[in-house]
A protein has these predicted regions:
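Structured beta-strand-rich core segments of catalytic domains in phosphoester-bond hydrolases
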Residues: 31-99
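Catalytic phosphate/metal-binding cores of nucleic-acid and nucleotide-processing enzymes, i.e., regions
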Residues: 10, 17, 22, 33-34, ...
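N-terminal, active-site-proximal structural segment of metallo-dependent hydrolase catalytic domains
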Residues: 1-41, 50-56
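Short catalytic/ligand-binding loop motif for oxyanion handling, primarily in non-cytosolic enzymes
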Residues: 12-14, 35-38, 97-100, 136-140, ...
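Metal-dependent phosphoesterases centered on the DNase I-like endonuclease/exonuclease/phosphatase
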Residues: 26, 109-192
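Active-site metal-binding loops of divalent metal-dependent hydrolases
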Residues: 8, 32, 94, 133, ...
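Conserved beta strand-loop-helix elements of the APE1-like EEP
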Residues: 51-67, 84, 175, 181-203, ...
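Active-site-proximal loop/helix segment associated with metal-binding centers of metalloenzymes
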Residues: 89-107, 153, 158
Length: 226
């Protein structure tokens, strides 16, 4: 099984061909437009968002039955729970404080999504929690619930682990491979995209190279093979 998460920086339908060679089973896409479920020949496409051309998509191989969970809470901006046979997936594009522009009764915080979907994630022996968290320990201030260390701790309590950090043994905040380049500048790099897995062992995880992907997006894809 192959899993990808990638913030495509808009116009995903025109960029998908760049992912096709990976032959992935599960693809979590941030900043993508709303498309029909059967838009892609080999994957079903599920979407959530408040802006038609800029939401969160999850693609599942058509060989696997999948659906959006009945628990889907649209007041949690850009978090999408997908149920497949024997596997739960929570796609993430954390809007954080920016979600406030959609009203006072919504949240874009990963901490709130974790709290809401906690039992759903706990009930499944095999799960994926991944995407663009827009978060890193380098930005943590004080002891806020939505600090990345707090999020990581909550995920650890649910038996999730970041595959990148498990494989590389690198400390959070000291990652050698960035996933995001602010304003597409190579010297403004951060690691803010993650794949947390539960009940699965990964063979490897790769992050796209700046030179290969920067023309397409300010984020690099994470590709994990199970």
């Amino acid at each position: 099984m192959k899993i990808i998460t990638w913030n495509c920086n808009l116009n995903f339908s025109k960029k998908f061909e760049n992912l096709e060679a990976f032959d992935s089973d599960i693809i979590i896409i941030q900043e993508c437009e709303r498309l029909k479920t059967d838009f892609f020949p080999n994957h079903n496409f599920f979407w959530t968002g408040r802006i038609e051309n800029k939401g969160l998509g999850v693609m599942i191989s058509k060989s696997t039955k999948a659906r959006i969970s009945d628990l889907h809470n649209q007041k949690l901006i850009n978090f999408l729970p997908i149920e497949t046979e024997g596997l739960n997936i929570l796609g993430v594009w954390a809007y954080n404080h920016r979600a406030a522009k959609f009203g006072n009764d919504v949240s874009g915080n990963t901490s709130d999504a974790l709290s809401f979907y906690k039992n759903w994630l706990a009930e499944s022996e095999v799960s994926i929690f991944g995407g663009d968290f827009n978060n890193s320990v380098v930005w943590d201030k004080g002891e806020k619930e939505n600090n990345f260390l707090s999020i990581k701790s909550s995920l650890k309590n649910l038996d999730f682990r970041s595959i990148y950090h498990h494989k590389t043994k690198e400390d959070y905040g000291s990652e050698k491979e960035p996933t995001f380049f602010h304003t597409k500048k190579e010297n403004k790099s951060y690691h803010i995209d993650y794949l947390f897995l539960k009940g699965m062992e990964a063979k490897n995880i790769d992050i796209g190279l700046y030179s290969d992907w920067i023309e397409l997006s300010d984020h690099m894809p994470l590709v994990c093979e199970i």
